[in-house]
């Protein structure tokens, strides 16, 4: 039977939820997540680093952490924003109304969100757009399905973010370059 639910939270920020026309509020996301868990489902919530762009990164990180803390899902999965051709956010980016963050700015947003997380589940970076570079040249985070156990491994994740911020930004994947090439 069905025992796991994957939910595209995207953000816990009500302003951004309106901008992207998600059709739900942060309170409704919290309510739905709690109901799914109370019904016995394993819950994976997906959030999108940089969905607020440079303009709203802080409120995006803070409010997403707030919502995730309230829900306390089994899994939190990072899916960094990559604007796709044919979408409104891509057109906003192309027209200069939305500004994609640099790799280090995305790590700063991730750092703030992780610092604010008080959950007892797992935080996962199991998608190729989380492929920031570590100092050894490999990926910064391990990208397996199980991720990092919180709160036990929270300090390790923050250490890895610090490491990523010390790596020259040109060594990280820059979403702007991928969008410009139209490779996604």
Regions found by a protein language model. Give the residues of each.
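A cross-domain feature marking catalytic cores of carbohydrate-active enzymes
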Residues: 7-11, 45-49, 78-80, 125-127
